[in-house]
Every structure is written in structure tokens, then in C-alpha cells.
Regions:
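Non-catalytic interaction-recognition regions
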Residues: 2-104, 111, 115, 119-580
Length: 580
């Protein structure tokens, strides 16, 4: 149950009932219909909830809003509600003050729902796919992949918490130009091992990393000179297969170490082998969106996007300024482009597997591809504008002691995900990378391993561990956490106690926001706020040494905080240690 929404609903119900009572008594005009807002004011000194009902209704009633508000307060019955008082404020606001029943029901809700606390059914019945990381399998994963991994995995969890049926997928680009380049790079290093470094020229556009040398060495170690004198295609196919068979399991292992598991690894090559790329291009042709030029087959991307922009209200002049261009789908040599395969892949997501919504997590450098891919789905009649969403994330800068870090101290090479996980705890990596996707972030390697309140993940985990220690100590003294229905919540009158329960109650709203905005960093900010609220409560309110009823009420509040901290930490893929 969302206790904040429950309180808002009750404010509306109380206000509506008071209006109907006043209208029946002839105190207010009948038949007035309004849709007022109910909000939590920034300053809760005068009330916990406020409504604009009187301001919205006064115009239709042709009365002063304060006069309407005064009548409603006199007609309002707060018996057996969450509220203890309602007051007129400002130009006609009604301010409601929460009572102990709401605070008690909030704690009871956490107890009853357990791990499901914070869940909502907004997306129930919807089938979502989140595709993320999808790193090039020709080399190690980098910091962009590290950030995208956390963002995609946590977003998927948030969507699940909002009721969606979520599928996590990694798209393996095991076909096309980059695999050809991968094979040529491995071939050069393989031959250099046998013929000598100077005897074989390395391709100028090849992959120059040491990982290519190592793969070639391993291939030579396994196969010897077996492939040296065979035809180039056979050698390239063998080298590419060997390299991918080595790299992909390593990627899976690193991502599993990072706490990420996929429902499927979808291989691009299967789209080509099954003929689905050709079939998708044919479907675009049948719909009149392709043409031939210079021996190649082109997608009329500019026309598709122009049609969409006109529907959105753009003028021909504005569209002309954009310089829209068309895209090659099939080259003159008969090979399909990466874009053609990408169109086929996304068509498969919608037309074959039936996802209601597809979310891709991409680096911001792919922003130019967003409209093109959405447009291609529109051209296929798959409503890419509304069913395909792209989350673009900005770059990551690694920093140590205020200086940008580009190379691993251990390897002397660009820092990979493996290097990062060797140095930084997984919890810190996941917490730090779960930042707002649209902001460029600095990952402070020094801060990530600090064990003090400056480290945000440590700060939150310490709050959880602190509560666990408290519970253990009190248990040793004979005090166990009571059930909510055995607690007198009217004893929790300190402002820090009530502020903490309000934070606990807001968790469901935060999950809703994170799902709506495709921004799971809402959960991080919530965790920091909840931990801060607990530390304030713990500093202000003694637990040990209090009278038993107060002790048990505060003990229950502490344990409820622990449960919600663990719930939210689990949601973002971090642990909640019981001692630190």
C-alpha cells in the first residue's frame, strides 16, 4: 500500500464529503465539480498535506476562497481518519495534520508487505524489454559499459517493482565490419607470431590492444601453424570464432560478478542466418520506404522523419534546416549494413516477441541514431515513437586524488570493467554508477573505498549495520521487535520520529518516479535521505533506558527503517551488511 497516496485520497474524500454536507445544508452552492490538487507542502510546520479544493471551487461558487474553506473546516468530520486537525491557511488552502493512526499504519504496512513493500501495479500486464551494455565482443568492456550495466539492470528492477514483466537482453554484435576487423587483427598477430613481427603488416584500422596479441597467442598455442597456409576466409572464420568463444564467456563472467544476469544473449548473426534481415528490408520495400541508388538499397529515412516531424507540428522550413539524410540498408556488394540488422533486431522485439515497450540504454554518442531507429519502426507500422524508448547516458570520468585516471596502475592499459572490479567493491561500483543518466559523472576511485560518511554507499550501509547492531544488543537484554499491532504509536511524538516514518512512507512514491523517469538514481537519493533521517532520529531519541512502551515503539521504528533500507538496497543491486 502507498501510504502517501492513501493520505491524499483521504484528504480528497474528506473535502468532498464536507462540501456535500455543506451544500445539503444550503451553506454552499450545489453541483460544483472541481479537480483539486493534494500536495505535501515544502514547509510542514502548519500541516502535512494541503489541498487547493477551496481555491478551485470558489470561482464556480462566486465566493471568497477563505469563506469556502472556513465553511468546509466546520463541516469536516475527522473521526477514524488519518488526520487530527484541518486548518484554513493563506488565500484558501486547507492544511491537514497527520495523527498517530497514519504513522502506525505505515509501519504496519512495511511489516505486512515485507519484500514487496514499495511495489505498485502501474505497469501490471505490460511486457517490457530492457537491452543494455551490448558491448562489442571484440575487446574488454569499458567504463561506459560499466555505467550502462548498472543503469540498465537497476532500471529493469525498478520496472519490475512497478508491476512490469521485464526481460533483460544483451545484443551480441557478432557479425559485420567489426568482426571482419577483429579477424584481420587476430590474423596479423597470429602470422606475426610465426613469421616475425616485421614480416606481416598489421591493418591500419585494426584493433591494436594487447588483448588481441594474447588471443592470437592462445590460438597459436592451441592450433599451432595449422591455419597458416589455408585460405584467408577459413583462417579468419576460425580466428573470429576462437576470439568470440573466449571473449563472450569472459564478458558473461564479469557481468555476473557485477551482479548482472540476462534472460538472453541475442546474437546478431542469427538474424542474418535466418534471413530475417533480408525479410525486414523487404517489408520496408513493400511499404514504399526504400529505393535503389548507385547499386545500393537505401532507406528513405529523411522522408520518414519529415513525416513524423510534420505530425509533431514542425514546418517545412524547420525540417529543411535539419539536413535529414537517408541510410544505406544493403551495400552495392550485396552485404547488409549494421543499421539494417539493427532494424531487423528491433522488428523482432516487437513483431515476433511481442514486447509492449522496448528500452535501450545507449551512450550519448549514439544520440543521432535514436530518431532513425524510431522512424524505421514507424515505417514498419510498429509505432516506434511510443513503443521504443532510448535512455542516453553521458560519459564517465575516473578520478583519483583530484586527477583524471586513464590507465590501470596494475596493467598500464585503459581501465576495463575487470580492472575496476579488482579495485573497487561491487556495491560501491553499482551505487556510484547509478547516477542520473543524462549527467556526465566523475567516479572518484578514492572516495569509493573510503569507510566514512563521505562515501555515500558506506553512509547508507552503515545506517543498516548500526540498526542491526542495536537490535542484537537489545535482544541480548531480552527485548525483541514487537508486532506493529502491539505498539502504541501515539508515543512517537518527536519530530525526528515522525520525519523518519514520513521518509519510510515515501518509498513507494520514489519507486513510481524512478520507473516513470527511467531514472533509478531516485532510489539512491531516497536511501541517502532515509539514512540521514534515521541518524537524526537516533541522535535525538534514546532507545535503551526508556520506559518499555516507548522503547518498544522506537525499537519497532528502527527495525522498520532497517527493512526499508534493505529493500531499497536490494532493488539497486547492493548488499545490506549487518555489521561493518
Amino acid at each position: 500500500m502507498n501510504m502517501i497516496q492513501s493520505a491524499k485520497d483521504q484528504v480528497l474524500a474528506l473535502t468532498t464529503a464536507a462540501y456535500q454536507k455543506a451544500a445539503a445544508a444550503g451553506l454552499l452552492p450545489e453541483g460544483v465539480t472541481v479537480t483539486p490538487s493534494v500536495e505535501i507542502p515544502k514547509d510542514t510546520a502548519n500541516g502535512d498535506y494541503t489541498t487547493t479544493f477551496c481555491l478551485a471551487a470558489a470561482k464556480a461558487m462566486r465566493m471568497n476562497p477563505r469563506q469556502v474553506a472556513q465553511i468546509l473546516t466546520e463541516q469536516m468530520d475527522l473521526t477514524d481518519t488519518y488526520f487530527t486537525s484541518v486548518e484554513l491557511a493563506g488565500p484558501g488552502f486547507l492544511n491537514f495534520r497527520l495523527g498517530s493512526r497514519w504513522f502506525g499504519d505505515t509501519v504496519a504496512c512495511v511489516e505486512a508487505e515485507g519484500a514487496d513493500y514499495g511495489r505498485n501495479d502501474t505497469l501490471t500486464g505490460k511486457k517490457y524489454m530492457v537491452e543494455f551494455v551490448s558491448a562489442n565482443p571484440t575487446g574488454p568492456m569499458h567504463m561506459g559499459n560499466a555505467r550502462g550495466g548498472v543503469l540498465g539492470d537497476t532500471l529493469a528492477s525498478v520496472l519490475q517493482k512497478s508491476g512490469a514483466d521485464v526481460w533483460r537482453e544483451f545484443y551480441v554484435n557478432d557479425a559485420g565490419n567489426q568482426i571482419d576487423k577483429f579477424a584481420r587483427s587476430l590474423d596479423a598477430r597470429y602470422q606475426q607470431l610465426i613469421r616475425g613481427e616485421d614480416a606481416v603488416e598489421f591493418p591500419e584500422d585494426g584493433y591494436h590492444g594487447d588483448d588481441i596479441r594474447e588471443l592470437a597467442r592462445l590460438f597459436y598455442q592451441q592450433e599451432g601453424e595449422k591455419y597458416l597456409d589455408c585460405d584467408e576466409k577459413t583462417r579468419h572464420d576460425a580466428l573470429a570464432k576462437f576470439g568470440l568463444d573466449h571473449n563472450i564467456p569472459k564478458m558473461k563472467a564479469d557481468l555476473a560478478r557485477y551482479g548482472i544476469q540476462y534472460d538472453a544473449w541475442f546474437f546478431e548473426s542469427t538474424l542474418h542466418e535466418s534471413g530475417y534481415v533480408a525479410d525486414s528490408v523487404k517489408a520496408l520495400t513493400q511499404r514504399g520506404y526504400t529505393y535503389e541508388k548507385d547499386g545500393a538499397l537505401w532507406l528513405a529515412t529523411s522522408r520518414i522523419l519529415a513525416e513524423n516531424l510534420k505530425k509533431a507540428g514542425k514546418s517545412d522550413e524547420d525540417i529543411e534546416k535539419l539536413g535529414l539524410k537517408d541510410d544505406v540498408l544493403r551495400r552495392a556488394n550485396g552485404f547488409y549494413t549494421y543499421f539494417a540488422a539493427d532494424i531487423a533486431y528491433h522488428r523482432n522485439k516487437f513483431a515476433v516477441r511481442g514486447f509492449d515497450k522496448v528500452i535501450n540504454v545507449w551512450g550519448a554518442d549514439h544520440h543521432g541514431h535514436v530518431a532513425r531507429l524510431k522512424g524505421a519502426m514507424d515505417a514498419l507500422g510498429l509505432d516506434g515513437e511510443h513503443r521504443l524508448d532510448i535512455v542516453l547516458m553521458q560519459l564517465v570520468k575516473l578520478v583519483r586524488d583530484g586527477e583524471m585516471v586513464r590507465m590501470s596502475k596494475r596493467t598500464g592499459k585503459a581501465i576495463s570493467l575487470t580492472d575496476l572490479l579488482d579495485e573497487i567493491p561491487v556495491d560501491a561500483c553499482r551505487y556510484f554508477f547509478n547516477a542520473k543518466p543524462e549527467t556526465q559523472m566523475e567516479f572518484d576511485l578514492g572516495l569509493a573505498v573510503r569507510e566514512d560518511s563521505e562515501n555515500p554507499v558506506y553512509y547508507v550501509q552503515y545506517a543498516h549495520a548500526r540498526i542491526c547492531t542495536l537490535l542484537k544488543n537489545l535482544e541480548a537484554e531480552g527485548y525483541t521487535v514487537p508486532a506493529a499491532d502491539a505498539v502504541d504509536f501515539s508515543l512517537l511524538t518527536d519530530e525526528t520520529e515522525q520525519a523518519l516514518i514520513k521518509q519510510i512512507a515515501s518509498y513507494g512514491q520514489v519507486v513510481l518516479l524512478a520507473a516513470r523517469d527511467y531514472d533509478p538514481s531516485h532510489i539512491n537519493r531516497y536511501l541517502t535521505a532515509l539514512a540521514a533521517a534515521f541518524h537524526k532520529f537516533y541522535a535525538a531519541c534514546r532507545i535503551k533506558g526508556e520506559e518499555k512502551p516507548v522503547l518498544l515503539a522506537r525499537l519497532k521504528l528502527a527495525d522498520t527503517t532497517r527493512a526499508v533500507l534493505k529493500n531499497a538496497m536490494t532493488l539497486i543491486g547492493c548488499s545490506a551488511p549487518e555489521k561493518m
